Amino acid sequence: MADSPNRLNRAKIDSTTMKDPRVLNNLKLRELLLPKFTSLWEIQTEVTVDNRTILLTWMHLLCESFELDKSVFPLSVSILDRYLCKKQGTKKTLQKIGAACVLIGSKIRTVKPMTVSKLTYLSCDCFTNLELINQEKDILEALKWDTEAVLATDFLIPLCNALKIPEDLWPQLYEAASTTICKALIQPNIALLSPGLICAGGLLTTIETDNTNCRPWTCYLEDLSSILNFSTNTVRTVKDQVSEAFSLYDLEIL
């Protein structure tokens, strides 16, 4: 599915910037400006949340196969959900909408974005290049060009710094926790949570399940709750939800 690996699409961690406490504070403030949803795709009459799960699984495989930056998929999900809370979609057009979201997300968050022709080819020509371009334009107009968003993956390194996790573990944690977050976002109940909470759940799940050389995940629970201004019960519950959503991903692939 993918061309030759393109590691240039994944930026290195800027530890100097990530250690500045203003970065985390600004993320928490910008998070408050995101639209709040009580459920996804309320206005849709034909496509369902189950269709969303199938579409996002394809979109995630796409981003992973082409080694796009880890933030491309979460941004594509955000764009998709915001768009389909405003405009009607159909089962016939859903893949085209998803492809357009990946196209936009990759233009914003990666060095070498996906191309229209490549996305058309990967859809088995379910739509033409022109149809995809027009779909991209429709999404941009519906969102009034406000496509960027604070993402769960944006919180990862600032939180690692705030939790005093050794800097040499950051790249490994970022890679593993980003994958956990991306797979969990496919489930609609996770997408309804705030990015900071999703990040907390993804980080704790990764520490629990991967060989990260960190302390046990419970050692970070209280500090993480304090940093994000949530109760420990809330963060623990979200961690359990993310763990469950992460485990569902492989079942859906099978």
Curated annotation (Swiss-Prot):
Gene: 72
InterPro entries associated with the record: Cyclin (IPR039361), Cyclin-like_dom (IPR013763), Cyclin-like_sf (IPR036915), Cyclin_dom_herpesvir (IPR015322), Cyclin_herpesvir (IPR017285), Cyclin_N (IPR006671), Cyclins_cyclin-box (IPR048258)
Alphabetized SMART domains for the sequence: CYCLIN (SM00385)
GO biological process per UniProt: cell division; symbiont-mediated perturbation of host cell cycle progression
The keyword Translocase is assigned to this record: no
Official protein name in the record: Cyclin homolog
Entry's family note: Belongs to the cyclin family. Cyclin D subfamily.
Keywords: Cell cycle, Cell division, Cyclin, Host-virus interaction, Modulation of host cell cycle by viral cyclin-like protein, Modulation of host cell cycle by virus
